[in-house]
């Protein structure tokens, strides 16, 4: 079984420029609606099964939370569901927002 990898904001920028990544944001809906990384999908318990059924398991998947803590557990869970290339964004949305403000 594979495990997730850590990803810096700079690495995420490079991946998104290459358009080779799926991004899931596990923050609450209000936080997501107030700001999120372009192209991110707001993943929650209600849409998790649908997402897993529709997602490309072979494409890199980046999990984003508030500060990079909760995303680690979610990233490991997604690895266990069959995703091959999963990352947790270090510093979470806060770090991404600071770097892109």
UniProtKB/Swiss-Prot annotation:
The active site is at residue 65. It is found in: Cytoplasm. It catalyses: thiosulfate + hydrogen cyanide = thiocyanate + sulfite + 2 H(+); thiosulfate + [thioredoxin]-dithiol = [thioredoxin]-disulfide + hydrogen sulfide + sulfite + 2 H(+). The keyword Cytoplasm applies. Its EC number is 2.8.1.1. GO terms for biological process: glycerol metabolic process. Keywords: Cytoplasm, Transferase. Its main location: cytoplasm. The keyword Protein transport does not apply. GO terms for cellular component: cytoplasm. GO terms for molecular function: thiosulfate-cyanide sulfurtransferase activity. Gene3D superfamilies: Rhodanese-like domain. Residues 17-101 form the Rhodanese domain. InterPro entries: GlpE_sulfurtransferase, Rhodanese-like_dom, Rhodanese-like_dom_sf, Thiosulf_sulfurTrfase. PANTHER family: FAD-DEPENDENT OXIDOREDUCTASE, THIOSULFATE SULFURTRANSFERASE GLPE. Transferase that catalyzes the transfer of sulfur from thiosulfate to thiophilic acceptors such as cyanide or dithiols. May function in a CysM-independent thiosulfate assimilation pathway by catalyzing the conversion of thiosulfate to sulfite, which can then be used for L-cysteine biosynthesis. Belongs to the GlpE family. This is Thiosulfate sulfurtransferase GlpE. It comes from Shewanella oneidensis (strain ATCC 700550 / JCM 31522 / CIP 106686 / LMG 19005 / NCIMB 14063 / MR-1). The lineage of its organism: Bacteria, Pseudomonadati, Pseudomonadota, Gammaproteobacteria, Alteromonadales. The gene is glpE.
